[in-house]
Amino acid sequence: MRTHYCGDLRATDIEQTVTLFGWVDRRRDHGGVIFIDLRDRTGIVQIVSDPQRTPDSYPDAETLRNEYVVKIVGRVSQRPPESLNPKIPTGEVEIYANSIELLNGVNKQLPFVISSLEAELVREDVRLKYRYLDLRRDRMAKNLQLRHAVVKAMRRYLEDEQQFMEIETPILTRSTPEGARDYLVPSRANPGQWYALPQSPQLFKQLLMVAGCDRYYQIARCFRDEDLRADRQPEFTQLDMEMSFMSEEEILRLNEGLVCHIFKSVKNLDIPRPFPRLTYAKAMEKYGNDRPDTRFGLELVDVSDIVKDSGFKVFSEAVKTGGKVKILPVPGGNETISNVRIKPGGDLFREATEAGAKGIAYIRVKEDNKLDTIGAIKDNLTEDQKLELLARTGAKSGDLLLFGAGDTDTVNKSLSRLRLVIGEQLGLIDPEKINLLWITEFPMFEWNADEKRLEALHHPFTAPNPEDLDDLKTARAQAYDLVYNGVEVGGGSLRIYQKDVQEKVFATIGLSMEEAYNKFGFLLEAFEYGTPPHGGIAYGLDRLVMLLAGEDSIRDVIAFPKTQQASCLLTEAPATVDEKQLKELQVKSTYKPKTKEE
């Protein structure tokens, strides 16, 4: 029976006899004495087998190799002063092995080095194919432990301090497509009919509020068939919450308590409260996006009113057609950003054009407020307009002003992208800093140009601001997102709980009443039986843990993730299935593999 985990042994355990299990991380032979680094999920401890002091274990120690699985019984001893290792928590002690029992060996060559003391860069596809080995590595083991600690902290706060109940909602449900594509599951018992895997528990958690559950949470598995990127997976996990009889302010404050509890529990950090807040409109104005990284400045400045009547048509036409002209001021930019980088072929030019801009206009502020700029600006802006630009941006000698002009969306996207790139390149972003803020008052709807209709910016169950009910098309939503260092980690809203308002929202996004009742009739009927006011929020667990772990991809905080092609390299899923299975489901595939010529 195991008495201790490897990484838990300390000087206070000296003279104890312990039983350990684990993997051989490294084996070294120094002058006839064998040293073994024994590893389990908690860390490493040094094992010593000496032919003089521990003759019974020595023959077995000689046979050990990396990643052999062993049981070791031995006595905890103080390390000699010259071999103390302050780099590991167990560095004051070592175990003299009385016995070593080999439980299992390694019969094939390891695809990569696992030892935490011999760092090796391994291609991600190899790591994913041998994920069970990758997860033995110290970094990955710590990421999984951090994930567990975050979930544990969530549960303790919600259950012990806020009286939430954990309730499971169905995984097999009906398809109500709104946004990403559903994963569909054919029903054998009901031929021709299909389940969908849930994109979120949204409707069920609202029904739980109708049921009087009052405060619900769930560590929920969700599924979306969408194009993937570094922070997306086809199946992902979220902390899902819903609360009755709470105002938006009360929900935000409760969630600030939750987030602060998580940081204190897993990082021992005290996060100041209340968190800063920005409306959606203000975030777009100052940063060009609704999830700004506020660890650094470089705020955008709207100068549309100054240049709307200028002779420079790029500026004046942008404003006349309903667009914007904004400036990204870069203090000291004359020294750090060359013209080569701004002009075609340069990295900043490329960043801007990839975001939709046609190019970058600029002004360099020289001594005595003299301006170095492109001819079109120099010749077509009056002296007063130039001085107004300097005054509004606060620019001084040595500063660089980068312009975005055009439709508002493109200007915001391009300058927001440049802001992040320049902020990182100039070392303005402190990686140790933690900035959390709420974004509030989102628009209810956005225009879908492909389908030529309005669609819900969040989802169609979000409650509109009561002040805006007379004109839903331009209404603000009672919605809120939590942004952590420029990454959205949570989002929620107050919900519609009145049938007539829900019907109006469905109509606004182009759903006929027949279609609305076909898809959501069960929800609309529930609203006729005394539905309480309610609201909620969901946190992307994978994304939150990724940030807390300092990783760049959520794949590094998920035990068995999919690739960006939505495949599992370990199990080779997805895969074809037996024709018999398809016949039982009365499903036929029309897919034909492409020929080489195609």
Swiss-Prot record:
It is an enzyme of class 6 (ligase). The keyword ATP-binding applies. L-aspartate binds at residues 178, 224, 458, 495. Its EC number is 6.1.1.23. Keywords: Aminoacyl-tRNA synthetase, ATP-binding, Cytoplasm, Ligase, Nucleotide-binding, Protein biosynthesis. Belongs to the class-II aminoacyl-tRNA synthetase family. Type 1 subfamily. This is Aspartate--tRNA(Asp/Asn) ligase.
